[in-house]
Amino acid sequence: MSSQQQKQPCTPPPQPQQQQVKQPCQPPPQEPCVPKTKEPCHPKVPEPCQPKVPEPCQPKVPEPCHPKVPEPCQPKVPEPCPSPVIPAPAQQKTKQK
């Protein structure tokens, strides 16, 4: 009977000792690693992305599009319109009558 009692208290103490040693060793290396990777990643990604996209896109698209469309359209519409042809036949018809 006495031999069983001695074995029981001896087996539990070594178990908690091993767990305590492993726990404090795992968290310390993870803590300093997490903030280091997040800090340099966030500011580097948005900085070069924002100024490169809007700068060359906005000024290049509207500049060549606006002046090229209205210029050739305005002079072509009034030119072919037969403004002197309308009064010419009108005068001839009145003279014939």
Curated annotation (Swiss-Prot):
Residues 31-85 are annotated as: 7 X 8 AA approximate tandem repeats. The modification N-acetylserine is found at residue 2. Residues 3-29 are annotated as: 2 X 12 AA approximate repeats. Induction: During squamous differentiation of epidermal keratinocytes. It holds the Pfam family Cornifin. Cross-linked envelope protein of keratinocytes. It is a keratinocyte protein that first appears in the cell cytosol, but ultimately becomes cross-linked to membrane proteins by transglutaminase. All that results in the formation of an insoluble envelope beneath the plasma membrane. This is Cornifin. It comes from Sus scrofa (Pig). The lineage of its organism: Eukaryota, Metazoa, Chordata, Craniata, Vertebrata.
